[in-house]
Amino acid sequence: MSWIIFYTVIAALLILDLRIIHKNNTIMSFKESVLFSLFYLVIACLFGIYVYYNTGADHAREYYTCFLIEKAMSLDNIFVISIIFQFFKIPWQYQHRVLFFGIIGVIIFRAVMIYGGIILINKFAWLLYIFAVILIATGIKTFYVSHKTFDIQNSYIYKSIIKNLNITPNLEGNKFIVKRNNKLYCTPLFISLVLIEAIDLVFAIDSIPAIFAITNDVYIIYTSNIFAILGLRALFFCLAEIVERFSYIKYSLALILIFISFKIFIHHYIAIPEYVAFTVTMTLLLFGIIASIIRKNMIDH
């Protein structure tokens, strides 16, 4: 029943998005972007309340902790998506179409990765320690790298697409694939969609291990992941303002990843309660937000 409720909510949100909010491919303003981002955030929080009443406080804390971590780590996806759209010169009115179908792929691929990861961890418990090392490396790198980049022209995926598929030189409206002379051609819109899906899989290698350190409950991991990613599409359209206002969140995220790694290494000796993990995650993110706001105000004055 819980899965039915989850997928019903997701389906309703996607239908609302495609058929009502973006029915005419209109460009989303900054104000609309912020409002819809808050709307998705409220829905995610309400679902957390449902988890609380359905499975208890511990699972609810796990859900919110996983949601916050995935939300923070997914911000880098926005940078790379922006690079991809700029590279292929995708107009604003078509970007939402790519992002919409991108989320469909994410729903499928994240399920495969999460289920596969849980099976591997249950069979090979030592994999968690490898994940911990990955998280430490990611956390340290986050301190020194402003944001993740993506060299499109030299990427294996882009080269493979160009080599093996027929590509149209220009956009064909909002179409992903067109037919010419009895041959199918992929448009730049389709290539950008494939690259965005591929990048999400790469970034998931960083974020999903962090979630596995919080819980191995498939329902909690998957639902928190999808709700966190859903709001990113709206968040994309106010990217510049977010980056400017909350520049210190990346340092909070780095500390969270290192804390989670520490939690993995000591869990056989000291079990850190989920409310502690949730409190640490919330506190570090709040410090990052507050520090960013203070810095912005100091610069403005």
From Swiss-Prot:
What is one GO cellular-component annotation here? plasma membrane
Question: Do you know which InterPro entries this protein is assigned to?
Answer: Integral_membrane_TerC (IPR005496), Integral_membrane_TerC_rswitch (IPR022369)
Q: What's a Pfam family this protein contains?
A: TerC
Q: What residue ranges are annotated as transmembrane?
A: 1-21, 33-53, 72-92, 101-121, 124-144, 194-214, 220-240, 253-273, 274-294
Write the record's keywords in alphabetical order, separated by commas: Cell membrane, Membrane, Transmembrane, Transmembrane helix
Q: Where in the cell is it found?
A: Cell membrane
Q: Which cysteines are disulphide-bonded?
A: none
Keyword Ribosomal protein among record annotations: no
How is the protein disposed in the membrane? Multi-pass membrane protein
Primary location group: membrane
- Give the domain of life: Bacteria
- Matches recorded under PANTHER family: MEMBRANE BOUND PREDICTED REDOX MODULATOR, THYLAKOID MEMBRANE PROTEIN TERC, CHLOROPLASTIC
- Which family is annotated? Belongs to the TerC family.
Q: What is this protein called?
A: Uncharacterized membrane protein RC1219
List the lineage, top down: Bacteria, Pseudomonadati, Pseudomonadota, Alphaproteobacteria, Rickettsiales
